[in-house]
From Swiss-Prot:
Listed InterPro entries: Mn/Fe_SOD, Mn/Fe_SOD_BS, Mn/Fe_SOD_C, Mn/Fe_SOD_N, Mn/Fe_SOD_N_sf, SOD_C_sf
Region named Disordered: 1-20
Top EC class of this enzyme: oxidoreductase
EC number: 1.15.1.1
Gene: sodA3
Chain residues that bind Mn(2+): 57, 112, 195, 199
Cofactor section: Mn(2+)
Protein name, as recorded: Superoxide dismutase [Mn] 3
Recorded superkingdom: Bacteria
Sequence ranges of Polar residues compositional bias: 1-19
Gene Ontology CC entries for this record: cytoplasm
Pfam families: Sod_Fe_C (PF02777), Sod_Fe_N (PF00081)
Origin species: Leptolyngbya boryana
Subunit structure: Homodimer.
Biological role: Destroys superoxide anion radicals which are normally produced within the cells and which are toxic to biological systems.
Amino acid sequence: ASTQQTPAQSPTASPTVSTPVAYVDRPLTASPAQLPPLPYDAGALSKAIDAETMRIHHDRHHQTYVDNLNTALKDQPNLQNLSIEAMLRDLNAVPENIRNTIRNNAGGHLNHTIFWQIMSPDGGGQPTGAIAQAINQTFGNFESFRKQFNEAGGDRFGSGWVWLVRNAQGQLQIVSTANQDNPIMEGNYPIMGNDVWEHAYYLRYQNRRADYLNNWWNVVNWNEINRRFQAASQQQARS
């Protein structure tokens, strides 16, 4: 069944959209797109996610986004020279006959590339450093932030993601995106995000998305999230 999608929006002029977002130091290449290895064993995140879910999620779902993206770009040399981020920021420049394919699969590739990095078997606990201070300033305290983040993830109807972003005004904001849309499509820099597609949690949690959302905090990689927050902040300061 096809999924109705809202039209892609051209991002507003924003310092946050000119920086890579898959990695803090380099853009995500499309020539060709490649599946990144997991930075830990598939069973390493068992505090929140079982090994079989991780293997299926990474080896099958993420690989499918990569394969579909490369197929769509096979006869598009001009697009192959762009980063994934650049394509998603300006979807109107993508030929109409492959626009939704690029939106879904480039988005899926980007989202999951971020997702694997912001989790760690040594993660969890309270945030520290600059991101902790920013969360406290914006949301009052970490518990308030976590509650709002989980509520946004729980309220996402169907498939999608919940994100903490730095918006065009330099403020932290919780947003939810449908399907495989990424916050850069609206001019926001994704600091962290959780996948609320059923394939991310169903083997272990079935329909208990709230339990998954709660347990996920046990593997959140605050060191990487601090790196991402600082990268967004530095880019904004230079602009």
